[in-house]
Structures are given as structure tokens and as C-alpha cells.
Amino acid sequence: MAAPGCSPVGIDKSAFVVRLPRVALRIPKQKSHRVASLLSKYLLDMPRVKHIVEDPQDPSMRLLLFSEAIAQPDLEGVSEEKILAVKEIVPLDVVQHEVVLDYSYWPVEHILKEILPAGCEVPSSFETIGHIAHLNLREDLLTYKKIIAEVILDKNPKLKTVVNKVGTITNEFRVPEFEILAGEPSLVTEIKQHGATFRLDYGMVYWNSRLEGEHKRLFAQFKPGQVIVDMFAGIGPFAIPAAQQGCAVYANDLNPTSVKFLKLNSDINKVGESIKAFNLDAREFMRKLVTEEEGCVGEIASSTLIAENSLNGTRIPSSKENSSSLTEGSDMPSSKKPEERKAKKAKVSEVVKMKISDVKPWEHFDHVVMNLPASALEFLDVLNGLLCKGRWKGTMPRVHCYCFMRSNETNADIVKKAETYLGGSIADPDVYVVRDVAPNKASLAFTAVVSWFISRSFIWSLYFFCLIQAHLVLDSIEHR
């Protein structure tokens, strides 16, 4: 059985037409605003409905629409003082007018509430990624998924595609599987964050618009001239802004499609010479980075501009074709004025860009970003014994690691886990709750400085292991 207001072939838009009879005052166009100011407290006050409209019988005349409280032709309810003041300007010409509210007037929530069966919770929000709306529909709404998607497209002209997440994330690249519910099939899109432009294939790479605030919080800690190591870089939400503010960035991701878009985004944002991209397992990436012979193996991103705005045969919309600018989890364009955007762009252009070719990562880097909450803690073990004190110069790096925390866990539990993987204690960790991702689950970030004790602990462990083995061998020889 179809839900009210919809049918197997789509939405019955005529079911949403509402006609409201209203009393109106007919006056000449040039005097309409003067009279309206006198009667303002009595006029129609509805969202997105004008209280001054053109007279359909005479374009030179206007109708002042009264509120529902003024329902009689004698304008009962309007003070005598106001009526006399109006008569001094224009003669009273009271008429009837019908306000028509059709499908286009009603917001998404109202339409869906009318369409969906009683008891169904109306989807109240969705994530927007460029021209794509990302839904997470519960099972009881899946029967109506196509209708829901159609309404969202109708009501958001900047959107072109609506998708729904299917199942849980099981692939090695942590990319959700999506079903396209309505609109264009292409998931290649473009978004803007903090003055940077990002292109991506939403069906092939990971992106979360709700993390915009966290991206800003972290890269605000980077200073011009610093060297950043991003172990799980994705398409560059940390790497690109860091390079824009004068950092050199070593960026790695296991997903080859993410790395391709990372390189493309480096070129789009003119920071290619400041970023070196790798497509490796994160542990292998870190070990290569601190080996002098291997530290230059990655590709400088500026050499990878993809011809004709295409990637793997998929056409990528240009910034002019798709210029949706996002706020965190929002589907609204940026409210910044052109002058503000130009000023911000000029400020970015003034920053002296670091050339990655001038950096020796085996000697120093300042920050390590580990943004893979599902398993980043496990990768902390690569830092155990990683750095060579004979070659390292300057201060030890700060590690920014993301993870999940269950409701029955504490910050101390997370730090203890981290210490287990690191192989040593963490002094003064800075723990920060990023956001709640589920009723009993939160995303957490902690920052700590790697100590030389941790850097050397693996070497000392190996040293003592060899001593013990040598002792056992000698002991066995003595007893022969």
C-alpha cells in the first residue's frame, strides 16, 4: 500500500496544495510600503510568503494581505486609529484573496511527515558531499527510500545525487558501500574546506564532511616550516591545508585511488612541490621515510596533474560546474562574501611554500598524523625503535593518533592501550573527544611527544634478546 501523498510511480504533488482565503487591502503600488508600515502588526506573517503581492487584475496595484485574525471585510480587529491613518493615504478597498501553498512551499520534513506512515521517524538530516546527499536510512524506512531521495533532490537544487549507505564497512580501505537512490550515477564530486578545493570519488575513497572542524583544530597546530608525516592521508584533508600554510608533508595512504586524488588535489591547490605522496602500508611507509636511501622514494605531487580533468576514465566536474562549499555536515553554500574569500586566498598565497625536495625526513619531522580510528592505535608499534639518535636532529615529533572509545572505557584506558603498542610510557598525553559516532561510542584524538626511551626500546629489547640467546648457547656448550 502506497503511503499518503505518494504512489508507486512517484510523489503526488497535488496532494500538498493548501488554499488559504485571506482578506486583503487593494492599494496603488507606489503607496503599498507606506501603508504596510502602518498596518504591519495586522498583516500576514508566514515563512517565505509575502504580505504584499501584485494584484492579478491590475499590475499597477498591490494587495496587502491580512493575517488570519483579520477575517471580516470591515477589518474588525484593526484599531480605528490605524484605519483613519490609512484613509488619509488611500481609500479603503477591501477584497478577498487566496494564498496558495503548493508542493514547492513545504520543507523536506513536512513532505516526508505527510508521506511516511504514522510512527516512522522522519530523517532529519543528511551529510552533503559536493553534489551528493549521503543518507543512513534505518531498516523501517528502506521501503520508502526512493521517495525520500526524490523529495531531497526536489528540495535541494544544488544536489544531483542521493545515496544510502549499505551494510557495514568491511573492505580494507574503510570505504562504505553505497546504493544510488536518485539522480545522477556519478559519485565524483568537488568540495571546499578552509580555502582548499578537494575532488574525490565518494564511492572509492573515504570522506566525512562532519570532520571539518577537527581538520581545522589539528592543522592549526602546525607552524610554517614544519615537516608533517600523514600515515593515513586519504585525499588530503590534513596534508593540503598543512602545505598551504607553509609545511612540507609526507602523505601516505593504502588506497591507490585516494593517493591519485591526493596528487590531483595537490595540483589544484598549487602545493604539489610541498607534498610527497606514497601508496604503501603505513608501517612500511614510516620505515622507508627514516631510511636515507628510501626517504626519497615517494612521488612529488606536482608532477601528477591528470590530463583533461579525468581519473580512471571518470570525468571530474570542474570547480565552476560544481562549486558547492560546505560547512560541517551541512548542505548549504558558504556565506562568505567575495571580498572575504579573496582576502583569504591572498593570505594563503603570501605563505612561503616549503619544497619537499629540501627535506630529509630521516633527520627530522615535527608531527605524525594517524587518522584511522578503527586501527590507528595498533600502528603505534612502528614508532618503537624507529628513529636513529645518531642522525636525528632537533626535538622529538608530536604524534596525533585517532581512535574509538567505548562507553565503558576511560581516557586512561586508551592511553594504556597506546602505551602497550608503543612499548613505553606516554608523558602528559593530551586527550580530546572529537565527536560521538554512536550512542555508546566516541571518536577520540590524543597527542603525545615520542620519547627517546620509546625510540630506543626496540633496539634495547633486541640487544637483551641476543644476550640471552648467547648465554643459552654458551650454557649448552658447557654442559656437553
UniProtKB/Swiss-Prot annotation:
Belongs to the class I-like SAM-binding methyltransferase superfamily. TRM5/TYW2 family. Signal peptide: none annotated. S-adenosyl-L-methionine binds at residues 215, 253-254, 281-282, 371. The keyword tRNA processing applies. One of its GO terms (biological process) is tRNA N1-guanine methylation. This is tRNA (guanine(37)-N(1))-methyltransferase. Residues 312-328 have a biased composition (Polar residues). Residues 334-346 have a biased composition (Basic and acidic residues). It comes from Physcomitrium patens (Spreading-leaved earth moss). It is found in: Mitochondrion matrix; Nucleus; Cytoplasm. Its main location: mitochondrion. It catalyses: guanosine(37) in tRNA + S-adenosyl-L-methionine = N(1)-methylguanosine(37) in tRNA + S-adenosyl-L-homocysteine + H(+). InterPro entries: MeTrfase_TRM5/TYW2, SAM-dependent_MTases_sf, TRM5-TYW2-like_MTfase, TRM5/TYW2-like_N, tRNA_Gua_MeTrfase_euk. It holds the Pfam family TYW2_N_2. Specifically methylates the N1 position of guanosine-37 in various cytoplasmic and mitochondrial tRNAs. Methylation is not dependent on the nature of the nucleoside 5' of the target nucleoside. This is the first step in the biosynthesis of wybutosine (yW), a modified base adjacent to the anticodon of tRNAs and required for accurate decoding. Its EC number is 2.1.1.228.
